[in-house]
Amino acid sequence: MRARAILALPLVLAATALTPHAAAADAGVAALQVGLHARGLYKGPIDGISGPATAKAIRKLQARARIEVDGVVGPKTRRALGRFARHRLGSRPLATGKTGWDVASLQFQLAEHGFPSGAFDGIFGPRIEAAVKRFQEWADLEVDGIAGASTLAALAAPPPTIPFPLAWPLTAPVLGDLFGPRSDHWHSGVDFPAPSGTPVYAARSGQVVWAGWREGGWGFLVTVAHGRGERTMYAHLSRIDVRVGVWIGQGVKVGLVGASGHATGPHLHFEVRVRGAAVDPMRALPET
């Protein structure tokens, strides 16, 4: 697990764009990365950012296809990507069995909105269908598992955020993996590596709605509800110190750091949900 102290220099994500202007994460770039990864040419994260690794992979693809090596994704380069270059997002309804650029773009947009569907692979299978249904329910759309015009329009809106501030769940937090792209999938929370037995504190007052073992890799988990569908989640604990149904205040100890569930080492996995959508906790935590 990558770790970085929050008292160190500010975290900066820098990338060299393929165009003269720096760009934020883009679902189309993520789809390109998925296609390059499928061809064995791109080993970086599927992060939707045009950086040096993406540019290098494009040139490798062009050289392999014996077309002009200019780093520009034009029609010939798209054809060289094969099935993963077909179908722009919005050109057709997406459902189980579909494959292509648009499916990979859809996966990335779903993840950005808090509904990841496993590895980014551009193949519409059961996990993408389930994520589409969860998003449709969240967005008050018809729940049919098909990503048509209304679903894509809703995904074009900004991702949700938590509407109130949070406190740090550890007294001396060190940042590990952040919310967002990690390798070929999406990390839905923030990891805080810490020694086993380190106290974990409620980031906001609320009612405990889960306190126990949870399958799916969570291990010992505490979930606290905060009102209108907002929840904070504290996973991989070694001990739980609260009970379901109890109202707790901000700063109350909920348990101890551990490595229960699917964890490579002792750390707190801290997750925030808004009506089921995973949102970036760092946007609500205090600046250091």
Model segments located where?
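Intrinsically disordered, low-complexity Ser/Thr-rich linker and spacer segments
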Residues: 75, 79-105, 112, 149, ...
